[in-house]
Structures are given as structure tokens and as C-alpha cells.
Amino acid sequence: MTRETEYMKIALELAEKAREMGEVPVGAVVVFENRVIGKGFNKRESAQSPLSHAEIEAITEAAAYLRSWRLEDCELYVTLEPCIMCSGAIVQARIPKVYFGARDPKAGGVRSLYTLLEDERLNHRVEVVEGILAEESAELLSGFFREIREKQKLSKKQSESGNLE
């Protein structure tokens, strides 16, 4: 197993933790000198904060660990392509390399909709590696949303049958 796969597996475990909490299953880790120094998973629902994305959580923890906002010698591993907010945080943190699993066709800020991390107009550019455990990442997400749709259908049927009385 490559080190990239090893770190992405940790991110997937964090994504699973998010799923168990009813959060969109995205996980992220920041690695420094072959050690995980920051972990995060989506907490938007539990924190009721639009900023509580996995990447932001992991970057914040890593910055606290290093006592520096500059994460110049770190790598970020995330199960889903970062959005534009998280891409901005990656640039601001000066992270030089990002690995992600699945593309995000609705909100991707790295490849799908925008290429923010490689925009020459910014003062920092990031090397991007995509597709690490992409199938596993995508399946975790699609399974989560499938469960939500099934619960919504069941709830709708129950409310409709209750209204017929």
C-alpha cells in the first residue's frame, strides 16, 4: 500500500465517522513529516456552521499543532474535491500539495468547476493529485445520499397515508 493510499484510508475512516453522525461523509487529514497532525470531517450540521468542512477542521488542527498558519511543508488528503471555500483556505495556508478522492461536479473548486489551486493570479499554487481511493470515496457519498432519499420517501408515504384517514 502506498503512503498516499494509507493517508486517504484515514481520511475515509473520518468520512465514515461523519456519516454515522448524519453529516455529509467527507474526511481530511494534514500530514507533516509522515505524521498526521490534523484530522477533520464534516460537522456542518452538528456545529450549525457553514465553515465546518473537513478540510477547514484538519487545517485548523494542523496549524494549532505547528503553532503556525503556514503549512508549507504539509500535504492535505481529502476524500472529496475541495470546494472554493476550502480551496481558498488551502491557498492561504500555503499547503503545497493536495490529494483528493472523488470529484465534486456540483461544488468542486479544484478540477470540476474551478481550478483555484492552480490559478496563476494567486500568490500560491498547489500541486493536485486526484483519484486516490476515488471509488470508495464516491460510494460512501452516494450511499449516504441514497439513504437520505429513501428516508424522505418513507416519511412522505407515512404522512400521505396518515392524511387519508
Q: Residue locations for each model-derived region?
A:
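Helix-adjacent hinge/juxtasegments
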Residues: 51-52, 56, 60-93
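Short beta-strand scaffold segments in enzyme catalytic cores
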Residues: 26-34
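Short beta->alpha transition motifs characteristic of CBS
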Residues: 37-44
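Small-residue (primarily alanine) positions within well-ordered alpha-helices
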Residues: 11, 15-18, 28, 54, ...
